[in-house]
A protein has these predicted regions:
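Residue-level "edge-of-site" marker
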Residues: 5, 25, 93, 259-260
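Metal- and O2-centered redox machinery and metal/ROS homeostasis
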Residues: 15, 74, 231, 251, ...
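Residue-level recognition of alpha-helix initiation/capping sites
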Residues: 3-4, 71, 155, 237
Length: 293
């Protein structure tokens, strides 16, 4: 193995991996036909492939197991064809628990090469945990939509738990003014729910139980108030790609789209738009923001 991060390389060596000092040394140390499996960020894949491919021979195999855009897979596969290097895209799901549970593998590439690699896929995945989804790009296309769905599920849990967290609104001191719709029947909202306990009970036999909910419950167990988090949610690209595919296919995907937009909102990207809204309300009706002078 080779990693540009000395810390990551040291950890892998301690687990029994054999290390190489450079990409050239890595490729040279492999038995023929050589197989190199990449696990790098999407932005680094092209440069990494160019480096590795310069040392590979016809008949060698290059597997991208990261979260690449499937359109890039189509291009890379064509670029490697003149060198007769086989390219396989593998969407890998399982997160940090994959080492214990096995990884879900969504595979794209030539049938004969995927068949040749089956012993590796079988070793990495749980039973029935890998699938040859189709030709080049198919694996990462399926993984892209998988991650889009993940965004939607996560948003649904977060919104539902937020409703529960706010179910004691009648106990809060809120001013009465012309700019805020009054809460009718405040006595209907006097519940102090224990969110960590609710996530725990939902895990057990509930229709909405899932591994994501298990992880949510674990997070609340470690930090019931989630004080370690500011709520600025990143997005690594797959959600955006899923929405683009939905638009190109003219397929409605309102839940997945809203979940991506909410991540933008969490990072303050709607602040200017909200100021514009407040300014318009003030101009047409003299409406001031709550707390403003």
């Amino acid at each position: 193995m080779f990693d540009v991060s000395p810390k990551a390389a040291t950890e892998l060596l301690q687990d029994g991996a054999k290390g190489a000092g450079s990409v050239r040394d890595l490729v040279g140390a492999l038995d023929k036909p050589r197989l190199v499996w990449l696990m790098v960020p999407a932005a680094a894949v092209d440069n990494t492939i160019a480096d590795i491919a310069s040392y590979m021979e016809p008949g060698n195999i290059l597997v991208d197991g990261g979260n690449s855009y499937y359109v890039d897979d189509l291009r890379r596969s064509k670029e490697l064809q003149p060198k007769r290097i086989h390219y396989v895209d593998v969407g890998t799901s399982g997160g940090v628990k994959g080492l214990e549970r096995g990884y879900c593998l969504m595979i794209g590439g030539e049938s004969s090469i995927v068949e040749y690699l089956k012993p590796i896929f079988s070793a990495l995945a749980p039973e029935h945990g890998y699938l040859h989804c189709g030709p080049s790009g198919a694996g990462h296309f399926v993984k892209m939509v998988h991650n889009g769905i993940e965004y939607g599920i996560m948003a649904a849990y977060a919104e539902g738990l937020n409703i529960l967290q706010s179910a004691n609104i009648c106990r809060r001191k809120t001013g009465i003014d012309a700019e805020t719709a009054p809460l009718r029947n405040p006595e209907h909202y006097q519940y102090d729910f224990n969110i960590p306990e609710i996530t725990e009970v939902w895990r057990r036999g509930s229709v909405i139980s899932s591994w994501l909910l298990d992880l949510t419950a674990d997070a609340f167990h470690k930090d019931p108030s989630l004080s370690a988090f500011q709520g600025q949610v990143s997005d690594s690209g797959e959600g955006r790609w899923t929405i683009k595919a939905a638009i190109d296919e003219a397929v409605p995907a309102p839940v997945l789209t809203a979940s991506v937009y909410e991540r933008f909102n969490s990072r303050g990207h709607s602040d200017f738009a909200n100021k514009v809204l407040s300014a318009m309300r003030y101009e047409f009706g003299g409406h001031r923001e709550s707390g403003s002078r």
